[in-house]
Each structure stands twice: as structure tokens, then as C-alpha cells.
């Protein structure tokens, strides 16, 4: 479902996710000629927390994988709409939204008439698609 269900996106194993996995995610996208300045990571809040505490290098005075909400210079966005354990990297300008018609707002004075209220209902027909699946890579089951 969503970008994760789109055929053609890159994939990266998430077990023992390390700096090299992040670089590989970026490389998969760049090698497919989808590399643009607007790339970013999008992760579940749990994964962001995990990677904020995971050293990129060093253990005595470590440099962590995510610092200042960036991973290797790319922004890290957070949403809990992504499955726990998953993280995307890609060009999110390649996600397209299509709209058919306009927002249809209807006033229903009958449903709540006995209570003296008016019900307002809104309808809109939209869909979302990925224009270039190679512009994304997904790491799953990050540990």
C-alpha cells in the first residue's frame, strides 16, 4: 500500500542498519538517474529515535547517524503513517496527486433537524501515484 506497494522501487535490508545501508539507499536512487537536490528520508518515529542513538563512527566520542534531523546531509522527515521498522529515501516530488472534479460541499438540514443542527458533508475524488518508482528506495525491518 502506498509507495511501499509500488513495483519498481529500490529495496535495502534493514537488519542491523548501518551507515553503509544509508549510503546504499542513496546510491540506488542516484544510479537510476533520479538524483535531485530535493531528496529526503522519511521514517517512522521509532526508527528516527533508533538512528539518533546509533553511532555512525566511534564509540568513545561517537558521531551519530542522525544529527540535527539529517542523515548524510539529507533531511529526515517523520510520520507514523509508515510501518514501524521502515524508512524511505527518495525524491518525493515524484509522488503525484490527481483530483477529479472539485471539492463538493453539501449542506444537509434534515439529518440533525430534530436537534436544531445542520450537517455539512464534503466529498472529493483524489488518487495518488508515483511517477518514477526508481526515485525511491525502502529499507524494511530496520533493527
Features from the language model and the residues they span:
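Active-site pocket-lining segment
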Residues: 44-58
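Short gly/pro-enriched beta-turn/loop segments at secondary-structure junctions
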Residues: 33-38
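Alpha-helical scaffold segments that mediate packing/assembly in large oligomeric complexes
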Residues: 1-31, 137-143
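Sequence/fold signature of self-assembling virion shell proteins
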Residues: 55-143
Amino acid at each position: 500500500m502506498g509507495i511501499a506497494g509500488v513495483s519498481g522501487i529500490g529495496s535495502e535490508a534493514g537488519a542491523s542498519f548501518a551507515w553503509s545501508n544509508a549510503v546504499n539507499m542513496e546510491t540506488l536512487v542516484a544510479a537510476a538517474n533520479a538524483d535531485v537536490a530535493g531528496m529526503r528520508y522519511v521514517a517512522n518515529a521509532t526508527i528516527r529515535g533508533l538512528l539518533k542513538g546509533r553511532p555512525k563512527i566511534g564509540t568513545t566520542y561517537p558521531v551519530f547517524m542522525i544529527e540535527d534531523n539529517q542523515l548524510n546531509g539529507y533531511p529526515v522527515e517523520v510520520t507514523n503513517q509508515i510501518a514501524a521498522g521502515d524508512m524511505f529515501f527518495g525524491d518525493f516530488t515524484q509522488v503525484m496527486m490527481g483530483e477529479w472534479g472539485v471539492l463538493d460541499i453539501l449542506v444537509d438540514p434534515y439529518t440533525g433537524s430534530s436537534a436544531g443542527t445542520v450537517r455539512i458533508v464534503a466529498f472529493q475524488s483524489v488518487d495518488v501515484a508515483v511517477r518514477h518508482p526508481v526515485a525511491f528506495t525502502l529499507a524494511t525491518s530496520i533493527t
